[in-house]
UniProtKB/Swiss-Prot annotation:
Family annotation (PANTHER family): SUPEROXIDE DISMUTASE 2 (PTHR11404), SUPEROXIDE DISMUTASE [MN], MITOCHONDRIAL (PTHR11404:SF6)
Protein name as annotated: Superoxide dismutase [Mn/Fe]
InterPro entries: Fe/Mn_Superoxide_Dismutase, Mn/Fe_SOD, Mn/Fe_SOD_BS, Mn/Fe_SOD_C, Mn/Fe_SOD_N, Mn/Fe_SOD_N_sf, SOD_C_sf
PROSITE patterns per record: SOD_MN (PS00088)
Species, as recorded: Aeropyrum pernix (strain ATCC 700893 / DSM 11879 / JCM 9820 / NBRC 100138 / K1)
GO MF: identical protein binding; metal ion binding; superoxide dismutase activity
One Pfam family from the record: Sod_Fe_C
Entry keyword Metal-binding: yes
Enzyme Commission identifier(s): 1.15.1.1
Residues annotated to bind Mn(2+): 31, 79, 165, 169
Root EC class: oxidoreductase
Family as reported in the entry's similarity comment: Belongs to the iron/manganese superoxide dismutase family.
Required cofactor names: Mn(2+); Fe(3+)
Function: Destroys superoxide anion radicals which are normally produced within the cells and which are toxic to biological systems. Catalyzes the dismutation of superoxide anion radicals into O2 and H2O2 by successive reduction and oxidation of the transition metal ion at the active site.
């Protein structure tokens, strides 16, 4: 038997207009229903080709199909983190608490310094991609990353806990080519409760995956 499970588009945890005025409804609808859904369909299409190849029904260009899967799967995962990483104004925004705040203070010298560095990373991603705050299970520290496309420069082992999409489809209808203003306004909808939960999960579960049994 040859069979792979398929991916599904997750629902948003809020209405499409919930992040206004910082991200308008039109962007959210297009981004979720069209762009994210395209990555789900792309990942599933790659899996279907691999299934048919294994069954002997077709021959595939393995390299091309694997590249398609990597790109689309990563796009699906990044967006699946991105949506709950945000919350409507009043629930989102402000500053973090808990372990996230402690690590930011210890590593970056305070929230404002962290925010400035993360913002600079997101604003200067070459081409299209993501700004990422990830947990390093080996050192139990936070890392700021620039990810190009969805899967280029993503470092194996690091666990994303906060991401911002800086592909043009995430902001162009509202901010045109002003990525910087989009990034600055995005901080008003960051869901720090979600980030804290992701950090706790990573602290509890990620480290054993990358260390040899004692």
């Amino acid at each position: 038997m040859v069979s792979f499970k398929r991916y599904e588009l997750p629902p948003l945890p809020y209405n499409y207009n919930a992040l206004e005025p910082y991200i308008i409804e039109e962007i959210m609808k297009l981004h979720h229903q069209k762009h994210h859904n395209t990555y789900v369909k792309g990942a599933n299409a790659a899996l279907e080709k691999i299934e048919k190849h294994l069954k002997g029904e077709i021959q595939i260009d393995v390299r091309a199909v694997m590249r398609d899967f990597s790109f689309n799967y990563a796009g699906h995962i990044m967006h699946t983190i991105f949506w709950p990483n945000m919350a409507p104004p009043g629930k989102g925004g402000g500053t973090p608490g808990g372990r996230v705040a402690d690590l930011i203070e210890k590593q970056f010298g305070g929230f404002e310094k962290f925010k400035a560095l993360f913002s600079a990373a997101a604003k200067t991603v070459e081409g299209v991609g993501w700004g990422v705050l990830a947990f390093d299970p080996l050192t139990e520290e936070l890392r700021i990353l620039q990810v190009e496309k969805h899967n280029v420069l993503m470092t194996a082992g690091l666990v994303p806990i906060l991401v911002i999409d800086v592909w043009e489809h995430a902001y162009y209808l509202q901010y045109k080519n002003d990525r910087g203003s989009y990034v600055e306004n995005w901080w008003n909808v960051v869901n720090w409760d979600d980030v804290e939960k992701r950090l706790e999960q990573a602290l509890n579960n990620a480290k054993p995956l990358y260390l040899l049994p004692q």
